Amino acid sequence: AFGTSCPELAVSVGDSISCLIEGGNANVAMGNIVGSNICNLLIVLGFSAVFTPIVIKKSVCKKEYPILIGVSVLFAIFTLCFGLNNEGTNTYAILRWEGIILIIGIILYVLYLVWSNKKNKGITSEGEEIEEMSILKSIVFVILGAVGIVAGGEAVVYGAKNIAYGIGSAANLNHDLVEALVGLTIVAVGTSLPELVTSIVAAKKGQNDIALGNVIGSNIFNILFVIGIASAVNPLTVGNQIWVDIMVMLIATVLVFVFAIFGRINKAGGFILLTSYVIYLVYLIIRTVSGKDIAWALSVMFALYAIMIIYVLINGLIHKQKKKE
């Protein structure tokens, strides 16, 4: 999960440095992480479930997923409650001290993973062969990979900002909203491709725990480490429209959790997740074209999400009752 989040790290830190030097809002950095987390939950798990139903262990609901929910809520509180900038505007921000707390959070999370791994060290995977590699060769690969990620991240940030500027100028649209749209969609989907490939391959091999674990770990890493590092470098200010995107991220987290409670995301569930993303994408386009949040569009989107969550919950309870009978 940490490895597949490297593109998000490169893009968000790159945008943070760009804002530090040139000024402006970090719409790409914040949009990248929020959008990537939404993509992981709705697109990655959605496509994985369409290929092969995802069976979810009970331990995921009791341990890993509650951590993801807690981290997501903390991120929302930091951004929306404590993140108003000093200029008295409606701009939200992740401040430097908040970033440091998030970094401490990822350290604690890694320590928890190490402790959990030692606790379960008696459980091993059979039939797996690990290809040996010399230390020198490993170092070379790490250096080349790091250089590639950094260079790629800078290129993505530069390209995203230019795309946003070009679209905004040509169509006379709000620059911040266009930049947010690019960050939440094009950049987010692009940086989520490693998670998508990893999860689909794992699902096709029947390794469902890897598919879901990859998404959970990646989303936790995105918030605690990527946002933590990026905001520690430079506070991440972002337009006030981010509250809607964060709410969608929280709703997506809850929706997947409802599936997890009943231990399975089947093909129909996969289509529900993918449909949820399409609804969000339509809203983003409406918001960008109109230049502001539209009340009716917000109401329709949140109403549809509520219906989906209720449907999944009722459907899960019905299937659970049938199994008992």
Language model: regions and residue ranges:
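Hydrophobic alpha-helical segments, chiefly the membrane-spanning helices
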Residues: A1-E325
